[in-house]
Amino acid sequence: MKLPIYLDYSATTPVDPRVAQKMSECLLVDGNFGNPASRSHVFGWKAEESVENARRQVADLVNADPREIVWTSGATESDNLAIKGAAHFYASKGKHLITSKIEHKAVLDTMRQLEREGFEVTYLDPTEDGLITPAMIEAALREDTILVSVMHVNNEIGTVNDIAAIGELLRSKGILFHVDAAQSTGKVEIDLQKLKVDMMSFSAHKTYGPKGIGALYVSRKPRVRIEATMHGGGHERGMRSGTLATHQIVGMGEAFRVAKEDMAAENVRIKALSDRFYKQVEHLEELYVNGSLTARVPHNLNLSFNYVEGESLIMALKDLAVSSGSACTSASLEPSYVLRALGRNDELAHSSIRFTFGRFTTEEEIDYAAQKVCEAVTKLRALSPLWDMYKDGVDISKIEWAAH
């Protein structure tokens, strides 16, 4: 077993060797290096063929028409293109948008920008389990609502929203529905022939593909129109100009092909790893699981260890690559806005650690990690006067601290 151990698969995944191999064939002079937009020679034709093959592979994972897949630089760009693109195109119909308080920053900050442009946004509170329900959305709908954006799988707590039910509601009202699915490809079944979803964002690097490439699904039936945010040569049917990065695109296609092939078996394996980890730490007192225990992907275990500071726990776990709730918006030491939205108090939000497991995680790594977590939590609590007070039966929430 090699140290340190990577348990931060929701931040990024390593590229699968099968993906790296395919990518390497699109770079050198004796490889498939041409510009897919070069129509006058075989180098361009070959590159275009590879790009279209990858488009099919991405579409196949989510059961879409390849013509509905638009290449972007990643899920952040896909979210921007979908939300700004649709809001601007349909602004004459209304200027009200709906999203949730626990979306990824790529959605929240895009919404904030649209607010500055004169749109109105309703931000929904999730349930304490971290879910957004169709009833919440229905209650927030207005005559001038044109777009709702709700994520499929949450990046911090791994909860899975019922996008099928939300889609049915919104389609019946004629309101556009965008879903950020960066965290769900290869983990949750997605069938866009059945789902009433108008736009869906994808990322390669959360699914064992390269960074810097993503895609946006834009429905053809019913036809969804969006305004481009990137202008130039008119690539991707005018929705996203810029020379296509063949090696990145081929990598994303292969990653999604592998995901489709391996998903069922991989989910079973990762569920077993996650359960194995939890069984070894659940004896710890004052341990809280953040997010629904049932409506979540097995890859994510977000735990709060009360009376332990998340940052100090991360430092104590120097051989484990994990992230703390407060590090999800990395630069700030604010407690996680996702956990705060679930109603967790600052102390619990600050004591959270996100463990995310993946394709290359082993049982040996899980056992080592669980042992280290138990040791570190026990040691840090032994140093904590608050833990002593809790053990003595003092209700810490009732204490009035003197101001300094």
From Swiss-Prot:
<dbReference type="GO" id="GO:0044571">
    <property type="term" value="P:[2Fe-2S] cluster assembly"/>
</dbReference>
<dbReference type="Pfam" id="PF00266">
    <property type="entry name" value="Aminotran_5"/>
</dbReference>
<feature type="binding site">
    <location>
        <position position="155"/>
    </location>
    <ligand>
        <name>pyridoxal 5'-phosphate</name>
    </ligand>
</feature>
<dbReference type="InterPro" id="IPR015424">
    <property type="entry name" value="PyrdxlP-dep_Trfase"/>
</dbReference>
<keyword id="KW-0963">Cytoplasm</keyword>
<keyword id="KW-0001">2Fe-2S</keyword>
<keyword id="KW-0408">Iron</keyword>
<comment type="function">
    <text>Master enzyme that delivers sulfur to a number of partners involved in Fe-S cluster assembly, tRNA modification or cofactor biosynthesis. Catalyzes the removal of elemental sulfur atoms from cysteine to produce alanine. Functions as a sulfur delivery protein for Fe-S cluster synthesis onto IscU, an Fe-S scaffold assembly protein, as well as other S acceptor proteins.</text>
</comment>
<dbReference type="InterPro" id="IPR015421">
    <property type="entry name" value="PyrdxlP-dep_Trfase_major"/>
</dbReference>
<comment type="similarity">
    <text>Belongs to the class-V pyridoxal-phosphate-dependent aminotransferase family. NifS/IscS subfamily.</text>
</comment>
<keyword id="KW-0663">Pyridoxal phosphate</keyword>
<dbReference type="GO" id="GO:0051537">
    <property type="term" value="F:2 iron, 2 sulfur cluster binding"/>
</dbReference>
<dbReference type="InterPro" id="IPR016454">
    <property type="entry name" value="Cysteine_dSase"/>
</dbReference>
<dbReference type="GO" id="GO:0046872">
    <property type="term" value="F:metal ion binding"/>
</dbReference>
<keyword id="KW-0808">Transferase</keyword>
<feature type="active site" description="Cysteine persulfide intermediate">
    <location>
        <position position="328"/>
    </location>
</feature>
<dbReference type="InterPro" id="IPR015422">
    <property type="entry name" value="PyrdxlP-dep_Trfase_small"/>
</dbReference>
<feature type="binding site">
    <location>
        <begin position="203"/>
        <end position="205"/>
    </location>
    <ligand>
        <name>pyridoxal 5'-phosphate</name>
    </ligand>
</feature>
<dbReference type="GO" id="GO:1990221">
    <property type="term" value="C:L-cysteine desulfurase complex"/>
</dbReference>
<dbReference type="InterPro" id="IPR010240">
    <property type="entry name" value="Cys_deSase_IscS"/>
</dbReference>
<dbReference type="InterPro" id="IPR020578">
    <property type="entry name" value="Aminotrans_V_PyrdxlP_BS"/>
</dbReference>
<keyword id="KW-0411">Iron-sulfur</keyword>
<feature type="binding site" description="via persulfide group">
    <location>
        <position position="328"/>
    </location>
    <ligand>
        <name>[2Fe-2S] cluster</name>
    </ligand>
</feature>
<keyword id="KW-0479">Metal-binding</keyword>
<protein>
    <recommendedName>
        <fullName>Cysteine desulfurase IscS</fullName>
        <ecNumber>2.8.1.7</ecNumber>
    </recommendedName>
</protein>
<comment type="subunit">
    <text>Homodimer. Forms a heterotetramer with IscU, interacts with other sulfur acceptors.</text>
</comment>
<feature type="binding site">
    <location>
        <position position="243"/>
    </location>
    <ligand>
        <name>pyridoxal 5'-phosphate</name>
    </ligand>
</feature>
<dbReference type="GO" id="GO:0030170">
    <property type="term" value="F:pyridoxal phosphate binding"/>
</dbReference>
<dbReference type="GO" id="GO:0031071">
    <property type="term" value="F:cysteine desulfurase activity"/>
</dbReference>
<feature type="binding site">
    <location>
        <begin position="75"/>
        <end position="76"/>
    </location>
    <ligand>
        <name>pyridoxal 5'-phosphate</name>
    </ligand>
</feature>
<feature type="binding site">
    <location>
        <position position="183"/>
    </location>
    <ligand>
        <name>pyridoxal 5'-phosphate</name>
    </ligand>
</feature>
<dbReference type="InterPro" id="IPR000192">
    <property type="entry name" value="Aminotrans_V_dom"/>
</dbReference>
<feature type="modified residue" description="N6-(pyridoxal phosphate)lysine">
    <location>
        <position position="206"/>
    </location>
</feature>
<comment type="pathway">
    <text>Cofactor biosynthesis; iron-sulfur cluster biosynthesis.</text>
</comment>
